[in-house]
Amino acid sequence: MIWKRHLTLDELNATSQNTLVAHLGIVYTRLGDDVLEAEMPVDARTHQPFGLLHGGASAALAETLGSMAGYLMTRDGQCVVGTELNATHHRAVSQGKVRGVCLPLHLGRQNQSWEITLFDEQGRRCCTCRLGTVVMG
């Protein structure tokens, strides 16, 4: 297991109360040895005006996963902030849920890079993101 902080899924989800994460309906669903996953509904909260998943909502899910994964790699007195987010949208999604899968690309003492892939309910890749974070403190 790569994580330096050991939180349960319930504890991870509790951090989202009264935030954008909760408003968008994002829920952490899996914390594996080197992976963090979450789901987000595709509904009125996350649609753009034409009834498709908004690219900004996809980016919010990606940044949520990468930032929390980065936080799990810190020690007491440290936090992480995102410095760069890149998102490539591959497929439109109009309903259901998307699942985000976050894996580390680089875990340095001060800089981290995370790959976050979003899948629709049929398991098709709909968005690929990369998040860079900086460890502070």
Curated annotation (Swiss-Prot):
Catalytic site: E63
Protein's UniProt keywords contain Acyltransferase: no
Query: What gene name is given for the protein in this entry?
Result: entH
Biological function: Required for optimal enterobactin synthesis. Acts as a proofreading enzyme that prevents EntB misacylation by hydrolyzing the thioester bound existing between EntB and wrongly charged molecules.
Q: Which Gene3D superfamilies match?
A: Hotdog Thioesterase (3.10.129.10)
Q: How does it assemble?
A: Homotetramer. Dimer of dimers. Interacts specifically with the aryl carrier protein (ArCP) domain of EntB.
What does the entry list under GO cellular component? cytosol
EC number(s) of the enzyme? 3.1.2.-
Q: Give the protein's recorded name.
A: Proofreading thioesterase EntH
Superkingdom of the organism of origin: Bacteria
UniProt similarity note: Belongs to the thioesterase PaaI family.
